[in-house]
């Protein structure tokens, strides 16, 4: 199958560090912030007012919802969804295939795919 190269769309009000890397097909919405040396994979959505801080690695097909905040040096695996208003503390890894619920707070590594909610998070599915 032939490889496709999709457009990357960045809203004019988004703030992206010159040292950040953004994959093809990724959409960065209004007032989103992507800071220094962050790497965002292909096909991601960095939604309105979301922030991805320094040195984060965001896998492919990740959705960071409206107002979610990802602190520095966070690693998020492929096909993970971070819910509206969620917070991920610094130096945390989240494996691929996870759902982090709205308003959840992640303060430790997530090593098993599933659905996590609460403050701090707990696995529910």
Language-model segments: residues:
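Short helix-capping segments at alpha-helix termini
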Residues: 1-4
């Amino acid at each position: 199958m032939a490889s496709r190269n999709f457009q990357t769309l960045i809203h004019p009000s988004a703030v992206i560090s010159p040292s950040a890397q953004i994959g093809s097909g990724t959409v960065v919405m209004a007032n989103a912030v992507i800071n220094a040396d962050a790497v965002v994979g292909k096909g991601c959505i960095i939604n309105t007012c979301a922030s991805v801080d320094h040195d984060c690695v965001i896998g492919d097909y990740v959705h960071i919802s409206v107002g979610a905040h990802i602190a520095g040096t966070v690693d998020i695996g492929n096909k993970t969804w971070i819910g509206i208003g969620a917070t991920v503390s610094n130096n945390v890894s989240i494996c691929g295939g996870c759902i982090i619920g709205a308003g959840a707070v992640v303060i430790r590594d997530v090593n098993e795919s599933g659905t996590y909610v609460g403050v701090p998070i707990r696995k529910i599915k």
